[in-house]
Amino acid sequence: MKKEAIILLNMGGPNNLEEVEVFLTNMFNDKNIITVKSSLLRKLIATLITFSRTEKSQEIYNQIGGKSPIVGHTKKLVEKLQNRVGENIIVDFAMRYTPPFVSEAIERLSDKNIEKIYLIPLYPQYSTTTTKSSLEDFEEQYHLSSGDAILVEIKHFFQNKNYNMAILERIKERVSLEEMSEFDLIFSAHGLPLKVIQRGDTYQLHVQKHISILEQMMQKEGMTFKNIHLAYQSKVGPMEWLKPSLEDKLREIKNRKVIIFPIAFTIDNSETDYELEIEYREVAHEMGYEEYRVCRCPNDSEYFVEALVDIYAKMR
């Protein structure tokens, strides 16, 4: 009997401190991240960046348990989605830069008589640096494996109602309806170099559209904040990136009570557990914030599971 498979794709994160170097090496060798045409030059750049950042990155991961939480959360999500769709559909996941890699997921499917593989990158908004990179990685390796299943892909899902309900649920976990009007809400998105957007990447537009959808949904749910903002985090290097930065936005806001939701991430990782929870909490404290609260990502929430069921159904 022919079967179908759902493969969830994400960037990954170190499963231990030794894998930090693997993570950085693979990420900065990605042609969608370092976009120079010469693979030799890209390798040189990747080596230099990895050498300069490994020790500092290991210190960061050491502060959040010695590893990224992304694989653990994803395993729970896969288990719940598998239970939801039933045993006739195989649900698995693969990471772009750390184990489990795409090659491992393909190997597990090799003797399962798969007719169609549904690829769902866990990035709500499309970007060449994330969605395109993950899809290309799977496509290239699957064709090298001589697989003959049909690959079906989705590019983004920020409009999905159940996914957005998962976001509202996470926000309501951190602040009650009664006290929302005392808080500013910041949707913090992972930043990108401005030149990526200028080349036609739709990420910034998708983030803006996503926030507009969420604002309409919050209004219907009676979720009223003092103000709602967009800011960008995680800038590295000297190039100009999307603005405003999260630090600048925190400095600009007059109200000293703030809720942060990481709008670009579906699964908690170092950018949420360290950068938002620890690093920017210290920044906010130094700025005199009375309240600084960070929402969890959807992770394995029931609404997110239902969103993935929706997405799969619409892809069929």
Curated annotation (Swiss-Prot):
Choose any GO biological process term that the UniProt entry carries and state it: heme biosynthetic process
Assigned GO CC terms: cytoplasm
Task: State the EC number(s).
Answer: 4.98.1.1
Taxonomically, the superkingdom here is Bacteria
Where is this protein localized, as stated in its record?
Answer: Cytoplasm
What keywords tag this UniProt record? Cytoplasm, Heme biosynthesis, Iron, Lyase, Metal-binding, Porphyrin biosynthesis
Q: State the InterPro entries in the record.
A: Ferrochelatase, Ferrochelatase_AS, Ferrochelatase_C, Ferrochelatase_N
Query: Looking at its record, which EC class is this enzyme?
Result: lyase
Catalytic activity annotation: heme b + 2 H(+) = protoporphyrin IX + Fe(2+)
Metabolic or biological pathway: Porphyrin-containing compound metabolism; protoheme biosynthesis; protoheme from protoporphyrin-IX: step 1/1
The residues that the entry says bind Fe cation are H190, E271
Primary residence = cytoplasm
Q: Which GO terms describe its molecular function?
A: ferrochelatase activity; metal ion binding
**Stretches that traverse the bilayer:** none
Q: Which PANTHER family match?
A: FERROCHELATASE, FERROCHELATASE, MITOCHONDRIAL
Annotated function: Catalyzes the ferrous insertion into protoporphyrin IX.
- Tell me its family: Belongs to the ferrochelatase family.
Name of this protein: Ferrochelatase
Please spell out the taxonomic lineage of the organism that makes this protein.
Bacteria, Pseudomonadati, Campylobacterota, Epsilonproteobacteria, Campylobacterales
* Gene name of this polypeptide: hemH
